Amino acid sequence: MQSQRLRAHGVQHVDRVPRPEFALYFSLILIVAVPFALVGWVMALVRERRIPECGPFARAWREAGEITPEIFRP
């Protein structure tokens, strides 16, 4: 691939380098999401009487990974 630009559905997408702001927002959202994910994990543990597939930290990581890009979307 000669160029770092991708074209999909008529829109150009440029590969972006992760910026310090992204890491900062990701870590802040992760810190806030961990307690809520822990509560959700415990509730699922009690409700289903078995250990959920992903742990509370993995759940918080996934949520932070979904929320943070939405902040920087143009």
Curated annotation (Swiss-Prot):
Source organism, top-level taxon: Bacteria
Stretch forming the signal peptide: none
One BP annotation, GO: photosynthesis
Keyword Phosphoprotein attributed: no
SS bonds (residue pairs): none
Pfam families: PufQ
Annotated keywords: Bacteriochlorophyll biosynthesis, Chlorophyll biosynthesis, Photosynthesis
Family label: Belongs to the PufQ family.
Record's function text: Required for bacteriochlorophyll biosynthesis. Directly involved in the assembly of both the B875 and B800-850 pigment-protein complexes.
Protein name: Protein pufQ
